[in-house]
Amino acid sequence: MRIADYSVTKAILDRYGFTFKKSFGQNFLTDTNILQKIVDTAEIDKSVNVIEIGPGIGALTEFLAERAAEVMAFEIDERLVPILADTLRDFDNVQVVNQDILKADLQTQLKQFSNPDLPIKVVANLPYYITTPILMHLIESKIPFQEFVVMMQREVADRISAEPNTKAYGSLSIAVQYYMTAKIAFVVPRTVFVPAPNVDSAILKMTRRDQPLIEVQDEDFFFRVSRVGFVHRRKTLWNNLVSHFGKAEDTKARLEQGLALAGIKPSIRGEALSIQDFGRLADALKQVGL
């Protein structure tokens, strides 16, 4: 019997009198086939260490520990720490860290792996309410995570993996795809969780690029310009740029100059621009003094 078997999950929750906290976005997966698919998708073996975020009662952790060299699981809810010590007692390659992943000193923490030189993959069922901050925090850290295989709300997975000229495409797509390739591996129905969430989930597989997708003069400015392009999706790029940078005649002249330099029509909408287009635009706007 697996931790994720519904009867086992229920027995564990009953034994500890555990009640779900909505503020932590707790939804425990009770389908062993899906857990098997997750570790298969992540291609976990003894040559990699794994970071897990939000292990819950250890359903996914159990599968990861069987395959990985070591697992470091970050759990914010201190009530789950003794439960995890119980459910994972047969494994000597799991460390449970009772800490918010966003506040953890990851550089120091990762040195606690027996072999910290092994590649690190992030495999997790992320809390819906904080998926994007966690992902961006990890992606933008200087830690070379090799791969992410993470479950999240289907809508967020669609946005991250979206292509230009689609409804889901936006600044989040650009922010992630600048660093990573991103592809939905499979969809997970809401019915396989306790308690069931209101929406379906998806497993997103993201692999770090050797180099960012494009080279830009100023990364922060590039991300800023890409966000500006989507502030009002139905407005033209020109209107969004003017709203952000200002309506002074000198500013508008510089914007016109930058757009011309980048070879981009002012009348286009942000969703029609590729990451490469936004890169050219950001560099051009920088060049004209914005």
UniProtKB/Swiss-Prot annotation:
InterPro entries: KsgA/Erm, rRNA_Ade_diMease-like_C, rRNA_Ade_Mease_Trfase_CS, rRNA_Ade_methylase_Trfase_N, rRNA_adenine_dimethylase, SAM-dependent_MTases_sf. It catalyses: adenosine(1518)/adenosine(1519) in 16S rRNA + 4 S-adenosyl-L-methionine = N(6)-dimethyladenosine(1518)/N(6)-dimethyladenosine(1519) in 16S rRNA + 4 S-adenosyl-L-homocysteine + 4 H(+). GO terms for molecular function: 16S rRNA (adenine(1518)-N(6)/adenine(1519)-N(6))-dimethyltransferase activity; RNA binding. Its main location: cytoplasm. Its EC number is 2.1.1.182. S-adenosyl-L-methionine binds at N27, L29, G54, E75, D100, N125. Keywords: Cytoplasm, Methyltransferase, RNA-binding, rRNA processing, S-adenosyl-L-methionine, Transferase. It is found in: Cytoplasm. Pfam families: RrnaAD. GO terms for cellular component: cytosol. Belongs to the class I-like SAM-binding methyltransferase superfamily. rRNA adenine N(6)-methyltransferase family. RsmA subfamily. Specifically dimethylates two adjacent adenosines (A1518 and A1519) in the loop of a conserved hairpin near the 3'-end of 16S rRNA in the 30S particle. May play a critical role in biogenesis of 30S subunits. This is Ribosomal RNA small subunit methyltransferase A. It comes from Streptococcus equi subsp. zooepidemicus (strain MGCS10565). The lineage of its organism: Bacteria, Bacillati, Bacillota, Bacilli, Lactobacillales.
